[in-house]
Design a protein with these regions (language model features):
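Contiguous beta-sheet cores, especially beta-hairpins with glycine/small-residue-rich turns
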Residues: 154-330, 334-337
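Short, linear, compositionally biased motifs with a strong N-terminal bias
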Residues: 12-13, 264
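C-terminal segment of classical bacterial N-terminal signal peptides
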Residues: 16-24
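Alpha-helical, heptad-rich or low-complexity scaffold/stalk segments
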Residues: 26-146
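Low-complexity, Gly/Pro
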Residues: 2, 24-26, 337
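Bacterial N-terminal signal peptides that target proteins for export
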Residues: 1-10
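Alpha-helical transmembrane segments
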Residues: 14-17, 277
Length: 337
């Protein structure tokens, strides 16, 4: 089984590399152009942040850390092949991030997409094997999968229905002093999304939003305001599905006493506006000037979306939470037709 997984890994690398189209030499510039942007994306995935130095030396290091060797080809070909391997995968094999998320979920029933690839693998090895193992990150991921999910990890096409309601929480405290218009906001999925026994988004998956208005407390007792619009849910893959605070999400939020309590504790007199009033966003007014980390929000998918999920084997299906995520609730998470 170990040899089979290694052969599949090697084939995936070669397939991704063979699919790369050659770009012009103008892409490889020292002016922060596409070549630098692609490499920074790779380094952010692998290490958590971009590194310093020349393009070639940085790419060589990343390839050795992920594959255990340097890939052949031009700089552009190698970068594209590596990014595809990390994020897209092939027609027969899901991406490394997809596999990693499934393995992480199998270990702890949640994922940490905000962590670097290296940290996520180190953490799983410590939990499963007692200590951090050496070697290429891709090989270490495959070894973990062999131990945790010996049948392997494949991606299954799944449709997420429109108005699928999901529960999220703020990853950081927002105040009228530490945010400004257009700032990105990250929330985390509180409950996993499972559709027809396919894991689509584990607990801990990210939901992205942005700040659309900030007003500090003003004269004559006028309250402070923070206005936030929701953008996308990141499912395993990683792919993004557009979300907003529509009517279904608003009803779920109003029905959940825990959510009402969390919001009320952060802002007195909070006001929820539906998609007509806020383009799918959320407005808070009150005398306090912060929205606490952990504050709960419901959002919903704006339309049906085709994504990929992981078909959960019957022997571990008990790890998932059963229910209907489209209902206004705070505990169920599975969609069945």
């Amino acid at each position: 089984m170990k040899l089979k997984n290694m052969l599949m890994l090697a084939a995936a690398i070669l397939t991704v590399f063979a699919s790369v189209t050659v770009s012009s030499a103008s892409d490889v510039g020292a002016d922060g152009g596409p070549a630098f942007q692609t490499l920074e994306r790779i380094e952010t995935i692998v290490y958590g942040s971009p590194k310093g130095g020349g393009l070639l030396s940085r790419l060589n290091t990343a390839e050795k850390d992920v594959f255990g060797r340097e890939l052949p080809g031009s700089l552009t070909e190698r970068q594209t092949a590596m990014l595809d391997f990390l994020e897209k995968g092939t027609t027969t094999q899901p991406s490394l991030l997809f596999k990693l998320s499934v393995a992480e979920w199998a270990v702890s029933q949640q994922i940490h997409p905000e962590w670097s690839l290296a940290r996520r693998i180190d953490t799983m090895e410590t939990i499963v094997e007692g200590t951090v193992q050496g070697g290429a990150l891709a090989s270490r991921t495959e070894r973990l999968i062999t131990k945790l999910l010996p049948e392997g990890v494949l991606a299954t096409p799944v449709e997420i229905p429109a108005t699928t309601v999901v529960k999220t929480s703020l990853s950081q405290t927002l105040t009228v002093k530490n945010v400004k218009v257009d700032d990105k906001v990250v929330l985390k999925l509180v409950e996993e999304i499972v559709i027809n026994n396919n894991l689509v988004a584990p607990k801990g998956s990210r939901v992205f939003a942005h700040i659309t208005k900030v007003k500090p407390p003003r004269s004559f007792g006028r309250p402070s305001e923070i206005e936030m619009a929701f953008d996308a849910l990141e499912v395993i893959g990683p792919n993004s599905v557009t979300v907003a605070m529509g009517e279904a999400a608003k009803k779920a939020m109003e029905a959940d006493a825990a959510t009402v309590g969390a919001v009320g504790a952060s802002f007195a007199g909070a006001v929820l506006l539906g998609p007509l009033g806020l383009a799918g966003g959320f407005l808070v007014r009150g005398s306090d000037n912060h929205l606490k980390e952990g504050t709960l929000f419901y959002v919903e998918t704006t339309s049906a979306a085709n994504v990929h999920g992981y078909m959960i084997p019957s022997q571990i299906s008990s790890m998932t939470v059963s229910g209907d995520v489209t209902a206004p609730q705070g505990t169920s998470s599975e969609i069945n037709p």
